[in-house]
C-alpha cells in the first residue's frame, strides 16, 4: 500500500471500531481518530451527555460536521459512530474520501461487549438492550453494506488479527 489511503471503519456499537482502528493505525503508522472522542474533546463532555442535552438530531448534526472535517485529512484511520451512516451526506463523504471497512458482529457479541459500557446512550432506555440492538441492526446494516468496500466479521478475533485481515484486503485491491 504505497500511498496512504484513508480508512474509515463503520459498523454497529461493540463491533470493535475504536479498538481495531487504533491497532490498524499503529500497524500502518497512520493517525487514528474516533468521531465520538473528537466530539467529546470539542464539547468537553461525554457523548452520552451531549446526546441527552442536544437529542439525537443535535448529536447527529455535530457528528456529521466532525466526520466531514476529519475525512478531509489524508492518511488517517477513522472509527465512526454506529449511527453516523444515517446521514446521507456522511455516507457520501466516507465513500468518496477513503476505503470504507464494515466491521460486522452478532447481536450476542454486541451485548457482551457493551453491557458494562456507560457511554452508550441508545442502550440506556427502558427497552431491553437486545431489542434496541436488533432495531438498530435492521435500520443501519443496509446502510453499512451500501457504502462498504470491505466487510469483515469481528466475532472471536483479536484486534490485531482483524487489522491484519484489513491490511491484507487493502493490499490485494
From Swiss-Prot:
Pfam families: SKI. GO terms for biological process: amino acid biosynthetic process; aromatic amino acid family biosynthetic process; chorismate biosynthetic process; response to antibiotic. One of its GO terms (cellular component) is cytosol. It is an enzyme of class 2 (transferase). Residues 116-127 are annotated as: Lid domain. HAMAP family: Shikimate_kinase. Two isozymes have been found in E.coli. AroK has 100-fold lower affinity for shikimate than AroL, suggesting that AroL is the dominant enzyme in the biosynthesis of the aromatic amino acids, with AroK playing a secondary role and possibly participating in an as yet unidentified cellular process. Belongs to the shikimate kinase family. This is Shikimate kinase 1. It comes from Escherichia coli (strain K12). The lineage of its organism: Bacteria, Pseudomonadati, Pseudomonadota, Gammaproteobacteria, Enterobacterales.
Amino acid at each position: 500500500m504505497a500511498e496512504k489511503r484513508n480508512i474509515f471503519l463503520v459498523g454497529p456499537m461493540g463491533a470493535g471500531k475504536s479498538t481495531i482502528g487504533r491497532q490498524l493505525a499503529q500497524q500502518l503508522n497512520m493517525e487514528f481518530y474516533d468521531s465520538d472522542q473528537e466530539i467529546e474533546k470539542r464539547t468537553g463532555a461525554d457523548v452520552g451527555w451531549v446526546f441527552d442535552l442536544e437529542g439525537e438530531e443535535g448529536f447527529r448534526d455535530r457528528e456529521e460536521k466532525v466526520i466531514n472535517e476529519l475525512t478531509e485529512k489524508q492518511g488517517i484511520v477513522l472509527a465512526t459512530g454506529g449511527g453516523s451512516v444515517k446521514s446521507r451526506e456522511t455516507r457520501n463523504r466516507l465513500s468518496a474520501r477513503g476505503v470504507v471497512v464494515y466491521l460486522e458482529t452478532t447481536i450476542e457479541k454486541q451485548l457482551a461487549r457493551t453491557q458494562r459500557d456507560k457511554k452508550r446512550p441508545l442502550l440506556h432506555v427502558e427497552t431491553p438492550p437486545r431489542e434496541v440492538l436488533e432495531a438498530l441492526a435492521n435500520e443501519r446494516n443496509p446502510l453499512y453494506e451500501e457504502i462498504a468496500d470491505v466487510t469483515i466479521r469481528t466475532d472471536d478475533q483479536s484486534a490485531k488479527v482483524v487489522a491484519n485481515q484489513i491490511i491484507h484486503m487493502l493490499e490485494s485491491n
